[in-house]
């Protein structure tokens, strides 16, 4: 931009309207030069020369018709194209029209590209657990727990002292002896498939206890010890499994297992007097 200041004598001779010379333009080759005059922020008259490169391009019919619209208002007598007095030339903004499917894909990637919402439960990687490359290997904690449970169940089944068959109460040890110390006290309680779970938190409930053991095997009953006055958990519970091998699997899997910021202690339930 080059500053051009005229004298008052030149303005009188030229008889300029509002004190500014008229703008002019000329074309030389593939370039168009437009010369304009205006006042800057300091109130001084300046000369502005704009250079445009002429390019020929094929545009849609709607764009061509829009360029031939008749101007109105203060721009009624303007030449085709933008007028610097009413139009401000700026950088071009290219628009791209996409379909609904492309928009959904673009929107999902722009939600938070730096953060992955998927987290693997096996290796804590940024992918879904079903796609984990370590699934089924030694790093898979679920596989390790299942292996321990199956091994404990097999060991319990192979115990020669436990046949796994139903034994009536009168055929058990001392069941047929009359006058014994247990006579008249009802049937003896079978604790062979019961386990004791200790080091539980005070907020432990029956629902939490069932969620903890239901994946190991079916159980017949549960008992969660609670304080008489406050109703809070005393820290231990008893679970009677339907099968002894499931009880052995529970001891192998849950003993030393972290639950609610505590380390569980699971062992066989001792016979009650």
Swiss-Prot record:
Extract one GO molecular function annotation from the record: mRNA binding
Q: Where is the major localization of this protein? A: cytoplasm
List UniProt keywords, sorted A-Z: Cytoplasm, Initiation factor, Protein biosynthesis, RNA-binding
Q: Which Pfam families match?
A: eIF3g (PF12353), RRM_1 (PF00076)
Gene Ontology annotations of biological process type: formation of cytoplasmic translation initiation complex; translational initiation
KW RNA-binding (keyword) present: yes
Q: Where in the cell is it found?
A: Cytoplasm
According to its record, what are the GO cellular component terms?
eukaryotic 43S preinitiation complex; eukaryotic 48S preinitiation complex; eukaryotic translation initiation factor 3 complex
Q: How does it assemble?
A: Component of the eukaryotic translation initiation factor 3 (eIF-3) complex. The eIF-3 complex interacts with pix.
Functional note: RNA-binding component of the eukaryotic translation initiation factor 3 (eIF-3) complex, which is involved in protein synthesis of a specialized repertoire of mRNAs and, together with other initiation factors, stimulates binding of mRNA and methionyl-tRNAi to the 40S ribosome. The eIF-3 complex specifically targets and initiates translation of a subset of mRNAs involved in cell proliferation. This subunit can bind 18S rRNA.
Task: Give the family this protein belongs to, as stated in its UniProt record.
Answer: Belongs to the eIF-3 subunit G family.
Instruction: Extract the HAMAP family matched here.
Output: eIF3g
Q: Which PANTHER family match?
A: EUKARYOTIC TRANSLATION INITIATION FACTOR 3 SUBUNIT G
> Which protein is depicted?
Eukaryotic translation initiation factor 3 subunit G-2
């Amino acid at each position: 931009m080059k500053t051009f200041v005229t004298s008052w004598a030149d303005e009188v001779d030229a008889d300029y309207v509002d004190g500014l010379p008229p703008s002019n333009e000329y074309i030389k080759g593939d370039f168009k030069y437009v010369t304009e005059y205006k006042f800057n922020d300091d109130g001084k008259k300046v000369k502005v020369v704009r250079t445009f490169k002429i390019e020929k391009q094929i545009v849609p019919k709607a764009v061509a018709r829009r360029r031939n619209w008749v101007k109105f208002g203060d721009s009624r007598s303007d030449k085709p194209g933008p007028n610097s007095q009413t139009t401000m030339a700026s950088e071009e903004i290219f628009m791209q029209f996409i379909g609904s499917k492309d928009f959904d894909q673009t929107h999902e990637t722009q939600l938070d590209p730096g953060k992955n919402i998927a987290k693997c439960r096996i290796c804590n990687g940024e992918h879904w657990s079903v796609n984990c490359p370590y699934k089924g290997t030694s790093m898979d904690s679920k596989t390790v727990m299942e292996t321990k449970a199956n091994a404990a169940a097999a060991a319990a089944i192979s115990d020669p002292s436990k046949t796994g068959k139903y034994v009536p109460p009168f055929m058990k040890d001392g069941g047929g002896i009359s006058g014994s110390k247990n006579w008249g006290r009802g049937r003896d309680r079978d604790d062979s498939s019961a386990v004791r779970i200790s080091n539980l938190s005070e907020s432990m409930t029956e629902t939490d206890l069932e969620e903890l053991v239901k994946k190991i095997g079916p159980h017949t009953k549960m008992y969660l010890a609670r304080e008489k006055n406050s109703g809070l958990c005393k820290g231990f519970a008893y679970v009677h499994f339907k099968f002894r091998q499931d009880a052995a699997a529970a001891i192998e899997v849950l003993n030393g297992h972290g639950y609610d910021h505590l380390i569980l202690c699971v062992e066989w339930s001792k016979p009650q007097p």
